[in-house]
């Protein structure tokens, strides 16, 4: 009987490992979101392997355990590829940026979110699904005199970018064909240095191949921008998803690893990071934290600080 149970468990675990390992063969959109959980699934597979070995110690159980450990190890390696490595942590930040998907139906917390944004001391704020803030815009605009988005009523209030400094240029465009106006490109002068700010809100990866098309458009946009770049927003995928990895690698984007988990809220720090803040040299992140309170959103917000490193020198904001 133990032999039968052993091989049944081995069969189920083999299939599960094979599905997760498909990422090394093909980036099938239906499994894209699953790939974001490779580390979590690897831990689950290790636990399952130990259960199998407790039932019967045979060589195939050890093979499954070894492969499960490889999935975890490679997940850690993949995250490390895009790490800033703690650069410039002893320097004063050039500016501070917040990025937060507040959830489009989060009306009851709109006042608290408004107060939190104003009290954050962020120089730039990137708010996604900002419709619930439609009745607090004037209060926000007093604290942040410059903004992009939410100009024509609450029904078109989706991405809202706020700044304490004037925008040198600004543009709102679409990515892919599923949703409109979810890519905002702007630039702001900090201490005599022009920093390019890009806000993106990608579709869920299991919505056919829409996210892939959006990433292609986003890559074209970033490829046309010279100089320091910050990319922030809701990617609906972790940094180890194959499509996101290829995008980050091609664009030379970095972040602080491990990234704070932003979803699902109930999982806390055991969740995954699907909301991101990336930087491209000569701009570097020195701090990346999640907000203390999600304020009713199904995402945790992020706040980051940056330094600009030209030949080892940092330009302070003025």
Language-model region placement:
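Short, Lys/Arg-rich, polar N-terminal cytosolic tail immediately upstream
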Residues: 1-2
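Membrane-embedded alpha-helical segments of integral membrane proteins
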Residues: 5-52
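Short, flexible segments with low predicted structural confidence
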Residues: 5-6, 88, 133, 249
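Short, aromatic-rich membrane-interface segments at the entry and exit
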Residues: 31-32, 58-65
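Structural signal for the C-terminal ends of transmembrane alpha-helices
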Residues: 50-59, 222
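N-terminal signal-anchor transmembrane helix
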Residues: 54, 63-119
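Soluble catalytic domains of enzymes that build or remodel membrane lipids, polysaccharides, and related
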Residues: 97, 103-118, 124-318
């Amino acid at each position: 009987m133990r032999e039968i149970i052993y091989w049944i468990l081995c069969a189920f675990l083999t299939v599960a490992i094979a599905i997760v390992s498909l990422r090394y063969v093909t980036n099938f959109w239906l499994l894209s979101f699953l790939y974001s959980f490779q580390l979590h699934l690897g831990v689950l597979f290790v636990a399952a392997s130990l259960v199998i070995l407790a039932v019967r110690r045979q060589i195939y159980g050890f093979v499954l355990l070894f492969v499960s450990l490889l999935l975890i190890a490679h997940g850690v390696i993949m995250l490390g590829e895009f790490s800033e490595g703690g650069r410039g942590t002893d320097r004063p930040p050039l500016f501070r940026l917040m990025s937060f998907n507040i959830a489009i139906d989060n009306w009851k917390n709109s006042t608290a979110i408004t107060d939190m944004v104003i009290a954050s001391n962020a120089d730039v704020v990137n708010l996604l699904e900002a419709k619930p803030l439609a009745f607090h815009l004037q209060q926000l605009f007093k604290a942040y005199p410059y903004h992009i988005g939410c100009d024509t009523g609450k029904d078109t209030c989706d991405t809202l970018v706020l700044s304490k400094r004037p925008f040198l240029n600004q543009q709102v465009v679409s990515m892919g064909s599923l949703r409109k106006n979810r890519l905002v490109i702007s630039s702001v002068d900090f201490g005599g240095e022009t920093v390019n700010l890009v806000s993106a809100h990608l579709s869920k990866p299991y919505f056919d191949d829409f996210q892939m098309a959006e990433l292609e458009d986003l890559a074209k946009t970033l490829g046309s921008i010279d100089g320091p770049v910050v990319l922030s927003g809701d990617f609906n995928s972790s940094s180890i998803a194959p499509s996101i990895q290829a995008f980050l690698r091609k664009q030379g984007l970095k972040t602080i690893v491990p990234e704070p988990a932003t979803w699902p809220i109930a999982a806390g720090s055991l969740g995954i990071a699907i909301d991101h803040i990336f930087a491209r040299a000569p701009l570097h992140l020195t701090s990346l934290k999640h907000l203390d309170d999600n304020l009713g959103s199904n995402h945790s917000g992020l706040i980051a600080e940056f330094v600009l490193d030209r030949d080892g020198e940092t330009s302070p904001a003025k």
